[in-house]
């Protein structure tokens, strides 16, 4: 509707669900009086900041496809699901550690160069595809993370994963720059990893690629789009044992 002014909403203090997508909003301050708000969608506006006055019951926000450049000023204590997809965010530093309830964070299609700043111990799903991430930093705080999407980034090394990420089950690294299996071996620190996507990395063109990954990561249940077959697993175990004996 090409709205630029939502000051009228200040009167409707009991609103729970508000969708203001596809307008021309630059200012959300009138929403600060909506203290009962549970759900807010403001996709496709002209917002340059996600900063808002703290709303005590707000659980879901989508700021997708705006012009937001940082993650400061998001402090809603019950926020569980936050989408900032398709903005211009360059760093997660400034993300409030007071987001105690945040489970899902969507940041696809931004300009992140690092994973530093995601100090969110309750986070379960983190979507970072289509950024410019070159380095993995600060992941040790993500102890409850189960899903991590890093597709279409610029990773050449896999330093940064650590054993404190004891719940991570699904990792998507498709279309990065992982060129050798020594980097894949660094994923051995992830005790619960079950599904891994490595398609469109240089290492996926190596001969016996699937076998080499399974030798390094014997607990995988799915590699790329296919489940790990029993005979594949047996062959990988056999080669691993032979190599271990040769090293002795």
Regions found by a protein language model. Name each.
Residues 1, 23, 45, 66, ...:
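Consensus "Asn ladder" position of solenoid repeat domains
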Residues 1-26, 38, 79, 120:
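LRR N-terminal entry segment and analogous cap-like coil->beta motifs
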Residues 3-9, 25-31, 47-53, 68-74, ...:
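The feature encodes a structural signal of leucine-rich repeats
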Residues 11-14, 31-37, 54-58, 74-79, ...:
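Leucine-rich repeat
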Residues 14-16, 21-27, 33-36, 43-46, ...:
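Generic hydrophobic, aliphatic-rich segments that mediate packing or membrane embedding
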Residues 15-20, 37-42, 59-63, 80-84, ...:
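Conserved hydrophobic beta-strand positions in leucine-rich repeat
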Residues 59-67, 72, 80-81, 85, ...:
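Contiguous hydrophobic segments
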Residues 73, 91-94, 113, 134, ...:
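Leucine-rich repeat domain C-terminal region
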């Amino acid at each position: 509707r090409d709205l630029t002014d939502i000051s009228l909403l200040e009167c409707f203090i009991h609103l729970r669900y508000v969708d203001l997508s596809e307008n021309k909003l630059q200012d959300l301050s009138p929403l600060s009086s909506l203290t009962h708000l549970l759900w807010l969608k403001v996709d496709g506006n002209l917002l340059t900041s996600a900063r808002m006055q703290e709303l005590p019951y707000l659980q879901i926000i989508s700021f997708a496809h705006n012009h937001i450049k940082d993650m400061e000023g998001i402090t809603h204590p019950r926020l569980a699901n936050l989408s900032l997809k398709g903005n211009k965010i360059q760093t997660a530093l400034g993300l409030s550690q007071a987001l105690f309830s945040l489970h899902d964070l969507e940041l696809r299609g931004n300009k992140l160069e690092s994973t530093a700043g995601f100090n969110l111990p309750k986070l379960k799903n983190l979507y970072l595809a289509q950024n410019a991430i070159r380095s993995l930093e600060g992941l040790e705080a993500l102890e409850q993370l189960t899903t991590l999407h890093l597709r279409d980034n610029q990773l050449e090394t896999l330093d940064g994963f650590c054993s404190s990420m004891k719940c991570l089950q699904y990792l998507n690294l498709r279309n990065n720059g992982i060129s050798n299996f020594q980097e894949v071996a660094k994923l051995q620190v992830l005790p619960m990893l079950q599904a891994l996507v490595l398609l469109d990395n240089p290492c996926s063109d190596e001969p016996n690629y699937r076998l080499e990954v399974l030798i390094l990561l014997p607990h995988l249940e799915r590699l790329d789009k296919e489940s790990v077959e029993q005979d594949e697993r047996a062959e990988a175990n056999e080669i691993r044992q032979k190599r271990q004996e040769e090293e002795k």
